[in-house]
């Protein structure tokens, strides 16, 4: 299967680290649970959202990121099973290089030629899209959609959009295996 995996918050701890750095620099106490929508401007004051958005231009932030638990092993397992895996990101062009550096540092087994910078992921032809941004998942109706749970994507009923919610990489792998088994069963019954 062709699997498109979002980069930020699926492979790395971008939002968690960004909030941590913001809180230290500003002596604030913003929590991940305060981020109730994907767009910071819809859940934080404009001043705070502006300051957080500025952090995305700071190389120190990108250098401080780490893989989330299970991401490295999960990505390796998907590749080992023979899936065609692409990492997708809707990043600013100036951050793309830093993202490639991160992959080379932590996911050296991954071919960085398979990283796609794309703002509208509904344009991707894939069997599965793994994301934390509900807007991207809702727009892409032609594939199986897996949402990694975060506070900013809890504001819909997943079943309405046939989105599979997972809480960690083990659950993501289980869901991919389930989808693969269902596809194999369908192909077997429709030959």
Model-predicted regions and their roles:
Residues 130-167:
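Acidic, Mg2+-coordinating phosphoryl-transfer loop and its flanking beta/alpha structural elements
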Residues 102-118, 159-177:
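Structural recognition of alpha->loop->beta junctions
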Residues 43-58, 82-85:
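Short, basic/glycine-rich phosphate-binding loops at helix/coil junctions
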Residues 1-51, 146:
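Active-site neighborhood of HAD-like aspartate-dependent phosphohydrolases
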Residues 62-66, 71-103:
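Substrate-recognition element of Asp-dependent hydrolases with the DxDx(T/V) motif
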Residues 84-86, 128, 146:
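A structural signal for isolated positions on well-ordered beta-strands in alpha/beta enzyme cores
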